[in-house]
Amino acid sequence: MAKVCQVTGKRPVTGHNVSHAKNHTKRRFLPNLHTHRFWVESEKRFVKLRVSSKGMRIIDKNGIETVLSDIRARGEKI
């Protein structure tokens, strides 16, 4: 399963670990993803989404119905 947020589209990015001696080694910065169940009142069921913590804040702000309609408009199956 891809490490991608279903709400924001956040995905891993690459960068460097930098030691005190300024040696650079490659690393990946991973998004803070959680699999979370949300209750959808209109459908009378839970929907399981893989969302980042920012995605959860967006759902709290806009509502799960609005966010689900945006995800479905992108063509993603839920």
UniProtKB/Swiss-Prot annotation:
Family: Belongs to the bacterial ribosomal protein bL28 family.
GO cellular component terms, A-Z: cytosolic large ribosomal subunit
Pfam families linked to this entry: Ribosomal_L28 (PF00830)
Superkingdom of the organism of origin: Bacteria
Annotated GO MF terms: structural constituent of ribosome
Identification of the protein by name: Large ribosomal subunit protein bL28
Swiss-Prot/TrEMBL keywords: Ribonucleoprotein, Ribosomal protein
PANTHER family: 39S RIBOSOMAL PROTEIN L28, MITOCHONDRIAL (PTHR13528), LARGE RIBOSOMAL SUBUNIT PROTEIN BL28M (PTHR13528:SF2)
UniProt cross-references to NCBIfam families, sorted A to Z: L28 (TIGR00009)
InterPro entries: Ribosomal_bL28, Ribosomal_bL28/bL31-like_sf, Ribosomal_bL28_bact-type, Ribosomal_bL28_sf
Coiled coil: none
GO-annotated biological processes: translation
Residue segments, region Disordered: 1-22
Organism whose genome encodes this protein: Teredinibacter turnerae (strain ATCC 39867 / T7901)
